[in-house]
Amino acid sequence: MSDNMQPTDEVLDDEVLDEAEGADSFDEVEEFDPFEDMSDEELDALCDEDENLAGFGDVEPGFRSGFVALVGRPNAGKSTLLNACYGKKVAITSPVAQTTRRRMRAVVNRPGYQLVFVDTPGIHKPKDGLGSELNKSALFELNDVDVVAFLIDATKPIGRGDAWVAEHVKNARSKKVLVLTKADEADPAQVMEQLKAAHELMEYDDEIVTSSVKNFNVDAFIETVAHFLPEGPRWFPEDMGTDASDETLVAEFVREKVLRRTRDEIPHSVGVICDALEQTKKVLRVHATIYVEREGQKGIIIGKGGEMIKHIGIDARRDLERIFGTQVFLELDVKVKAGWRDDEAQIRRFGYNAED
């Protein structure tokens, strides 16, 4: 190793093991106390800092907090339920399957508890590298949360897709809550049939029937999952709504407008990156690039005389002005990146990869 190179963690681990193996016993390895030279005052300050890092603000005894993953097939209503729980739109929605590509966290505060809802991509049989990453992202959350809310559409017969999701959900260590969504679109007999079929897939710790668009049982759903949260600190500040960056919100809301305007023509080939975001005194200046895989798709998004891209920009700007609370100047470009959905580097560039 040259003098200018820093040793990696693996090299350091190997060196520590080599020293230990060279000694007659581990007793001969010199003990190291990182706090040995610290005064009592410095130790107290370190402890105070550690307590501040563990949570935000004082909480009363019995305060509950934790993470709730919303999982299910594509178009099961996960993002719509997340928005309903939060009270306003933070996750994009569209009739197109696999609209959600990024894990989105939304913080919901209530007296006595804090819930962090995690919206996940729909779990499905992947057809490309992007689909595989979306599945990994969703499945990663199952054992990393306190509660898994398994969403099943009340209007669609339960099939192999739901069964495949259930196989993963039932093996999770988390509590499981069955959530039957879109109840406003189903008759009572259909709801009862869906509940029966859902219980043939697996066992649940609780269940609830909801309609996010009608705000039916949304608060009851929040209370249901909060019951399973452990006692703990407030993980996020009370004034924090989502962990998504401004750049992520820009990219997602632009992509949503593309999906809604183009529908079935090019949905899965679209990726968006926010290239620049600058806040001036009176306006937020934003530049984003829409990527597709073929020249023909680029033409569809631009539209005749630029009409389609104009409407996409107007729609996105309205949402961004609502989110950021300021006037937005939005500039959009459209570029072709052939085969990006099977390119791991490009998937990471768009931010659609599962966490390492």
Predicted regions mapped to residue ranges:
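Conserved C-terminal guanine-recognition region of P-loop GTPase G domains, centered on the G4
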Residues: 108-114, 133-207, 261, 278-283
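P-loop NTP-binding site
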Residues: 248-356
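Conserved glycine(s) of the Walker
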Residues: 77, 217, 308
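Catalytic P-loop NTPase motifs of RecA-like helicase/translocase cores
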Residues: 100, 123-125, 157-158, 186-187, ...
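Solvent-exposed alpha-helical segments within well-ordered globular domains of core cellular machineries
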Residues: 83, 102, 106, 136-143, ...
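Conserved, well-folded catalytic cores of nucleic-acid-processing
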Residues: 88, 107-111, 141-148, 201-204, ...
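Conserved G1/Walker A P-loop phosphate-binding module
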Residues: 2-5, 9-14, 18-19, 24-147, ...
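Canonical P-loop GTPase G-domain recognition
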Residues: 175, 184-246
